[in-house]
A protein has these predicted regions:
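Short beta-strand micro-motifs within the conserved protein kinase catalytic domain, predominantly
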Residues: 97-112
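Regulatory extensions appended to serine/threonine kinase catalytic cores
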Residues: 306-361
Length: 361
């Protein structure tokens, strides 16, 4: 085990290695062994304050030690809010599942460690390493995360940090939304807020400090899909340059925040481009107003090849059966009287037939 990996607050769970960092914390892979079988979880540890430097900085601004302690205690309550948010989603197949948590307060100093145990998943960044996602896979990702946002909306929760680093993949290939570290109930976030979140996927109204609603998560999801279908480049970044500079990123961000019309992502079909560009429209009123609406269009696109095949099979069936029906109609159509008489004569006794011919002569 890595010597820098801390000891778990759950004796039965051993922390093996650090696998990432999220909002205000580090994430570790943990293992529990029972009856010869190994089970795995992800444990996120949030330390408040994050460092001695942060503690000293706050101390210098506060009047006394009690005020300093209360300041950091409020941060602890904010982090516990993330835990309560995750509890709402227990059993949801498109949100990272919460399993348990513990809060430990230091005895000899101002500080807390918050441990959150969650299901162990593959990070989206690792999932994408060494391969390029097909449009079909990206559409599925869009569908899965749109379903996650539907549950957020039902609970009046805005995630505010939808980005590849907060997307995870289950062993069944389902995409999940995680890290609700800056999520807040919508009732408390409708007015101007701090610019928490990632600029690369941030909606313009947050960037400009304006009022916003849950459509900002739809915008961020749209930018995620855009990048995946645009050779892993954000809007307005050159597709020809191998090396993208900091200035390139700043210029691209400025153009996006100014409302310049985005070009279509180069690897997306026309139908998928329409969905993506609508999701990340500059004006909130021109976006999908609800994740349900975006999911509906994504599902139509996802099923389009299947529906087209079904329509082709139906048309072939109709053509085949139409031809067979026409043959049957010709075969069993009513006959002319003279045809019937002629067939009757042929079927008569030869002697009678001879007599009839002689009589006609």
């Amino acid at each position: 085990m890595d010597k820098d990996v801390p000891v778990s607050v759950w004796p039965e769970w051993e922390l093996i290695e650090k696998i990432g960092e999220g909002s205000f914390g580090k994430v570790y892979k943990a293992k529990r062994t029972e009856r010869g079988r190994s089970f795995y979880s992800a444990i996120k540890i949030i330390s408040i304050p994050a460092s001695k430097g942060e503690l000293d900085s706050v101390r210098s601004e506060m009047n006394n030690e009690q005020s300093t302690r209360e300041y950091f205690r409020n941060l602890v309550e904010d982090c516990i809010q993330e835990i309560y948010t995750m509890e709402h989603f227990c059993g949801n197949s498109h949100v990272v599942s919460f399993e348990d948590f513990k809060v430990v307060e230091y005895l000899d100093e101002i500080g807390w460690d918050i441990s959150i145990r969650m299901e162990y998943l593959t990070s989206f960044m690792d999932y994408c390493t060494g391969k390029e996602l097909t449009e079909k896979e990206v559409i599925k990702l869009g569908c899965d995360l749109a379903m996650a946002l539907i549950y957020c909306r039902k609970l009046n929760i805005i995630h505010r940090d939808v980005k590849p680093e907060n997307i995870f993949v289950s062993r069944f290939g389902d995409f999940k939304l995680g890290d609700f570290g800056i999520a807040r109930e919508q009732a408390h976030t409708m007015s101007n807020m701090s610019k928490k979140g990632t600029y690369s996927y941030m909606a313009p109204e947050i960037y400009k400090g304006e009022k916003y609603d849950s459509s900002i998560d739809i915008y961020s999801l749209g930018i995620v899909l855009y990048k995946l279908m645009n050779q892993n480049r954000l809007p307005f970044l050159s597709l020809d340059k191998q090396l993208i500079t900091y200035r390139d990123k700043e210029t691209a961000l400025a153009r996006r925040m100014a409302g310049e019309k985005m070009p279509a992502p180069v690897n997306a079909s026309a139908s998928f481009s329409h969905i993506i560009l609508k999701a990340c429209a500059y004006e909130p009123g021109k976006r999908y107003r609800k994740p349900e609406d975006m999911l509906r269009d994504l599902e139509k696109l996802r099923l389009a090849p299947v529906n087209a095949e079904k329509e082709w099979e139906k048309s072939q069936w109709e053509l085949t059966n139409s031809a067979e029906l026409e043959r049957d109609q010709r075969r069993y159509a009513p006959q002319k009287p003279e045809d019937c008489m002629e067939r009757t004569h042929v079927a008569e006794d030869p002697q009678i037939e001879k007599a009839v011919r002689e009589e006609e002569a």
